[in-house]
Amino acid sequence: MAKQSMKAREVVRVKLAEKYRAKREELKAIISGVNSSDEDRWDAVLKLQTLPRDSSPSRQRNRCRQTGRPHAFLRKFGLSRIKVREAAMRGEIPGLKKASW
């Protein structure tokens, strides 16, 4: 199990990313825009740097919904490999069965 503080930190990152999403997209459009002047680009870069660090979506980490484990995360299920295996063995995931050959 992950520490509660790590799970809470991840929740804060998700909220911040959603809060600043529109502003971040607007600034990035100015930076990558062909018609923007160099001064506008520089101002946009400086404004982007003033945004909170955790508002960037790349700082978010996929975590298991049950345990908070950050590694071996399977996006399709939202769980770690360990919890997917446990659920599959109990037959809780429709259409998923253990391979045998």
Swiss-Prot record:
GO annotation, biological process: translation
Coiled coil, from the record: none
GO molecular function ontology, one term from the record: rRNA binding
Superkingdom field: Bacteria
Assigned keywords, A-Z: Ribonucleoprotein, Ribosomal protein, RNA-binding, rRNA-binding
One GO term describing the cellular component: cytoplasm
Quaternary structure note: Part of the 30S ribosomal subunit. Contacts proteins S3 and S10.
PANTHER family to which the protein is assigned, alphabetical: 30S RIBOSOMAL PROTEIN S14, SMALL RIBOSOMAL SUBUNIT PROTEIN US14M
Annotated function: Binds 16S rRNA, required for the assembly of 30S particles and may also be responsible for determining the conformation of the 16S rRNA at the A site.
NCBIfam families from the UniProt entry: PRK08881.1 (NF006477)
Family listed: Belongs to the universal ribosomal protein uS14 family.
Name of this chain's protein: Small ribosomal subunit protein uS14
Organism: Pectobacterium atrosepticum (strain SCRI 1043 / ATCC BAA-672) (Erwinia carotovora subsp. atroseptica)
Organism classification: Bacteria, Pseudomonadati, Pseudomonadota, Gammaproteobacteria, Enterobacterales
Designated gene of the protein: rpsN
